[in-house]
């Protein structure tokens, strides 16, 4: 099977976000592979190990986004591709989906595209569905398990994790699959894998390389971003010899503050 895993470079989850000159700033925070995408990479590798084939990891972003591809290569992906162009700088998720779909079509003969559930920075979870729509392929979201896969018969069966329970779904291949963390436990890259990934040559595709003559403008613009105002809080400890005494004092204070 020929599988493409779409990943994103995000800031470390321990980062402190600040607002500078009306824009979000990550400061000197290290950038990492989006944690949700590790599960998509792992699942693609497991499919390859069982059915054979090739796993290509694809990312969209500046030149620095190559660093998000290297952990996936270290885990075992065969090839990494970065799609980067100054024209993509202000792309929203809808424009991003058009760019990614064009890159996937350039790769050709793709059987499956895998996404993580969402990115930890924007957390919209829309890009996978939008890419599936542009490709005209079935899209399976919130996948917690791939229960059956038939590369020859071009079919896939999955179990989706919904708020009210689980749902069994079957679709034809090629398909777009978005996974949740319950699907697997991502492997740790080996030392040799890390060394190999550090030396890997990652091609960069521009808008011309993927056949986009024009890049649509984002429908939404963020002219300025505001930091929420700081809230000063005063904590009052309710004391008492017994839980009952504390409860009475707490109720009295809430009545005084007209909370109840």
What does each of the following model-derived ranges do?
Residues 1-260:
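N-terminal glycine-rich FAD/FM-binding segment characteristic of electron-transfer flavoproteins
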